[in-house]
């Protein structure tokens, strides 16, 4: 779709993104025309994950006062499973030892109802006690060597089988009892999807009946038996999800089971009305934008259905400290990334008692600010014109060769390059490449989307024929949907090159020659005019051009890096292109044979970042909807609301950006140019989180303003008529 038409359409029908291509299969006939679904009601969530000694040992009114103070309108409360926090009547459903004759869950539910909150009740189905083991030993998970699986954190507990009678029978009874007694809006089950392959008698029999095979002996991703088990596992979990959801709806038709962690994003989006994203914090070497990644991956299939982002106030690392507290700055940046990318925040506190209150002021400050600007957070559609494709089938079916290791880093490198380039973007599910799902985007990026079916490739051809542009890297389309190698790229007609039967690498001490042609530099070399050359990628696909191309980036082949006396190029230049650029009507195609996206993630070369950004902007071939100038690293997202549009600016500039936690925030100044939607007039400009009206200028169709000293998050809002 042309940019003019896109902006016009989003201006007129802001909710079109939520409706396009997403079947309305689940809410029809449940809500009257005058009754809004509860799913969209609540904007600020809290989770209290009780521990067994909480009843009688903590002050529930303290939490109710805190909820009121920070404008909580949705709660997630622990109810049952491993421990019941209500007077259950189900045999073997362990009641908290500290409850006595009280109903601690019922008290909180009653008081939260008085405050008009949405209520989700949490169960935990992953572990059972000794008495349950003795009564139903077949309900317990079994290891590959035939041993009942003891819990890794507490040896007097047993890990349950997720796919057997414990969940299908016992937990179904628990969920029905909870629904009958408390009538929540939904049930959320912790660790319901299991912990790898279970070898219990039920799994052996059920997998054999479904596949004719014995259970796999290893979890090797590319093993054909393991792949069949993965499909069967997904089907069993879907059956369990649908069972629980059906039983819940029988009792309260508007309630739902919330399938957090279900291993198929397409099915998750198709069959969910509401979702909790449970990536609570970061650990290891990963930027804060990893919180946004999950929301972006779900949005293609969920549309604008609500996504609640659970965040921990403590550390989430291999060695678990569940009563810990993260730094104020780390909590703020993690939450900001979620909110800026369309998630509704939900803090989780383990245990009702507080040993360290430092997190509470940070959460209160954020929630109070988000409450004040709530109407600007009720998004109806993203406005990004760039879509980055992700592929679950590539991640499941592709690999095995040395150059295919760490293949997830293609997407991570491209994602980070988009962030560094301040380019607003959404993600695109490779199973949803039809016209309806792609019409919002002028450009699709395929970061080594290697495994594509013939039909998926035809959909991409139709997208290009309609005026869409493409940037693709490395082995994109060189394998079919089952991971079987093709003789040539399925998209060779778009790329204009053919596969030359090998992948080279590692390309040690190889370089990219950056050069002008006909006395000028190509736009992909903007900011690199004085470089002459830069480092090459680590691996590259050998290709043969099938047509003429410009040659702004060519190969300087590998030469020795030791001994030092031998470190000189044997060939100063070649005519072998490392970037293939072509135009067709309104479409532009860029194919990068090297693994530049993955190499960027591994090396973090600033030149690779510039090349990727420049190539993306060249292929976009239209004025960006938002242009941001800053010396920092700022994530930019753009949204429509009913009577406004917003630009979120999340400041990731920090010495701890790549490995948290942040110690403190480092404010940056940002200049912003925003394109006004066609046929709309700007009636006001706001900086929402500092609650000010900035100076701004309108020239033609562009609003320009400066936003100084952004510590973590700012939202620029344009009121529109």
Which functions belong to the PLM regions below?
Residues 5-28:
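N-terminal export signals
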Residues 21-44:
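C-terminal segment of N-terminal export signals and the immediately downstream linker at the start
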Residues 45, 74-77, 107-150:
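Glycine-rich, aromatic-flanked loop segments that form ligand/cofactor-binding clefts
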Residues 52-70, 93-115, 239, 409, ...:
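Aromatic- and glycine-enriched glycan-recognition loops and surfaces
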Residues 70-102, 130-138, 203, 265-274:
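Aromatic-lined carbohydrate-binding/catalytic grooves of carbohydrate-active enzymes
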Residues 125-182, 217-230:
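Active-site-adjacent "subsite" loops/lids of carbohydrate-active enzymes
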Residues 166-261, 265-268:
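Active-site neighborhood of glycoside hydrolase catalytic domains
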Residues 226-721:
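Carbohydrate-binding surfaces of carbohydrate-active enzymes
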